[in-house]
């Protein structure tokens, strides 16, 4: 039974996802359905967490929109995600960056990770 579930999970996982971690700035291209039309909307921000594993994996992106913090959680292997672009890699020492919620301006900046990796 477990083998059947693993095969179904493997079949529904995407293989076009770039490597990114918490602290990275990403642009998530999301398919939005409005009536009969489908268009692509870009949500760009900083990845503050990745949770789960396999086909259930999801990630949360935070951005500031007109001074208000906006967070959106995306299932990683969802068909509504058109593509994910990594803008820059951030140097952080935490897996969950929830402390960014209480910071504004320069205090919310994340240093760029060098090419040593």
Curated annotation (Swiss-Prot):
GO cellular component annotations of the record: cytosolic large ribosomal subunit
Record has Protein transport as a keyword: no
GO biological process: translation
Domain of life the protein comes from: Bacteria
Keywords from the UniProt entry: Ribonucleoprotein, Ribosomal protein
GO molecular function annotations of the record: structural constituent of ribosome
Family, per entry: Belongs to the bacterial ribosomal protein bL19 family.
Protein purpose: This protein is located at the 30S-50S ribosomal subunit interface and may play a role in the structure and function of the aminoacyl-tRNA binding site.
Protein name: Large ribosomal subunit protein bL19
Species this protein is from: Cutibacterium acnes (strain DSM 16379 / KPA171202)
Name of the encoding gene: rplS
């Amino acid at each position: 039974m477990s083998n059947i579930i693993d095969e179904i999970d493997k079949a529904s996982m995407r293989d076009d996802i770039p490597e990114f971690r918490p602290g990275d700035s990403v642009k998530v291209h999301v398919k939005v359905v409005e009536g009969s039309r489908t268009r692509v909307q870009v949500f760009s921000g900083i990845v503050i967490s990745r949770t789960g594993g396999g086909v259930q994996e999801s990630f949360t992106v935070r951005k500031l929109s007109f001074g208000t913090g906006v967070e959106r959680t995306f299932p990683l292997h969802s068909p509504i995600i058109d593509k994910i672009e990594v803008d820059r890699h951030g140097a952080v020492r935490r897996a969950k960056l929830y402390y960014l919620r209480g910071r504004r301006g320069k205090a919310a900046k994340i240093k760029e990770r060098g090419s040593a990796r």
